[in-house]
A protein has these predicted regions:
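Extracytoplasmic
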Residues: 29-56, 60-62
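Helical-face signature of the major facilitator-like transporter fold
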Residues: 34-38, 42, 73, 129-137
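Residue-level signature of mid-helix packing/kink "hotspots" within the transmembrane helices
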Residues: 46, 73-81
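Juxtamembrane helix-start elements in MFS-like secondary transporters
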Residues: 61-69, 125
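Helix-to-loop junctions at the C-terminal end of transmembrane segments
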Residues: 79-91
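C-terminal ends and interior cores of transmembrane alpha-helices
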Residues: 101-121
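Hydrophobic core of transmembrane alpha-helices in multi-pass small-molecule transporters
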Residues: 120-142
Length: 142
């Protein structure tokens, strides 16, 4: 089931005369992939903190939203610790984008508690947002 995360097959070493030219392009590909990927993770992770002032208009207090925000930090720390060994045994070309897509999808569902639970169900909305933000933090740790 998880074969798509398996590390790629070992490639033969390049001849010595081709190493410099091939590695120049690889350096840029790796740098841009990591830079864009990490920037995407950062934007997804910090998205909720920018929405906190707007959520106050819907009756949420900053103290309640800080609990939701702290779930992200807890999940991120746990995920970095636990998913590190998983990522070492995985294909980084699949693992990083998978984490980014899952984090973005989880963040897109953050509107559901605000839209579908009214002020009378604020505690349920906080719980759903906390679970979703935990998932965002977990996937960001991938």
């Amino acid at each position: 089931m998880w074969n798509f995360l398996a590390p790629p097959a070992h490639k033969q070493e390049l001849p010595a005369e081709k190493i410099d030219s091939a590695y120049k392009s690889y350096r840029w590909q790796v740098f841009l992939g990591i830079f864009i990927g990490y920037a995407g993770f950062y934007i997804v992770r910090k998205n909720f903190s920018m929405a906190i002032p707007e959520l106050a208009q819907f009756g949420f207090e900053k103290g309640e939203l800080s609990i939701v925000l702290s779930m992200n930090a807890v999940a991120y720390a746990l995920s970095k610790f636990l998913m590190g060994s998983v990522s070492d045994r995985s294909n980084a070309r699949v693992f990083l984008p998978l984490g980014l897509v899952l984090a973005a999808v989880s963040m897109m569902f953050m509107i559901v508690p605000v839209q579908f639970f009214g002020p009378e169900q604020k505690s349920l909305a906080i719980i759903v947002m906390a679970v979703l933000n935990f998932l965002v933090g977990w996937f960001n740790g991938m």
